[in-house]
A protein has these predicted regions:
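Conserved catalytic-core segment of nucleotide-activated headgroup transferases in glycan assembly
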Residues: 1-37, 43
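Nucleotide-activated donor-binding/catalytic signature segment of Leloir-type glycosyltransferases, i.e.
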Residues: 27, 31-61, 67
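C-terminal alpha-helical cap of glycosyltransferases
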Residues: 31, 151-168
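Short alpha-helical segment that forms part of, or immediately flanks, the ligand-binding pocket
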Residues: 59, 77, 81-86, 100-101, ...
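Aromatic "clamp/platform" in nucleotide-sugar-dependent glycosyltransferases that forms part
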Residues: 73
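Short hydrophobic beta-strand element within catalytic cores of glycosyltransferases
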Residues: 90-93, 103
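A short, well-ordered alpha-helix in the C-terminal region of glycosyltransferases
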Residues: 133-148, 157
Length: 168
């Protein structure tokens, strides 16, 4: 459901096309050996954000990455997209479910059509690297987070909604 196969194949495509790329896989307790043993895969495993040591490891991983690729096939509300923006990681994903609430094409990542392939992802990422969009999205992703993807903004919106409803 999360599109791990596409993420792996995209990373493979990028490497085969002259763009040295590592895929850091976070969140899977037991990654299949055939994936884990690929030379471009870093198996981080599941990290519990409630455990300070594991949380710090997650933050360290984020700081050493340049983008989030999460080609999920079904997603209502992915906190990972908001967190990626907070740390300046552009996100590459499918346009499905609630994802358009989190990703603004060209600002904090890109949403691809559901029929897109790993090569489509690879070509887009390669083009973003070549023309500087990836670097620009690093800054604008943080802006998107500050404008709309953080808990303070959510609290203000909820407060306004409740106030509007109770004033009627």
């Amino acid at each position: 459901r999360k599109g791990g196969d596409i993420a792996v194949e995209t990373t493979k495509w990028l490497n085969e096309n002259g763009i040295p790329t590592q895929l850091h896989i976070v969140g899977i307790k037991s990654l299949d050996d055939k994936i884990k043993n690929l030379p471009f895969v870093q198996d981080i495993g599941f990290l519990n954000k409630n455990n300070k040591t594991e949380y710090n490891r997650l933050i360290d991983e984020i700081y050493h990455c340049h983008a989030l690729i999460l080609p999920t096939h079904a997603e209502c509300s992915a906190i990972a997209f908001a967190e990626a923006s907070a740390y300046g990681l552009p996100t590459f994903t499918f346009q499905t479910g609630g994802i358009p609430n989190y990703i603004e094409n060209g600002r904090n990542g890109y949403m691809l059509a559901m029929n897109s392939t790993s090569e489509d992802y690879g070509r887009l990422i390669a083009q973003c690297l070549k023309d500087g969009r990836l670097e620009r999205m690093t800054n604008s992703a943080k802006e998107v987070y500050l404008e709309k993807l953080n808990w303070n903004v959510w609290a203000k919106k909820m407060n306004n909604l409740i106030t509007d409803l109770t004033d009627k």
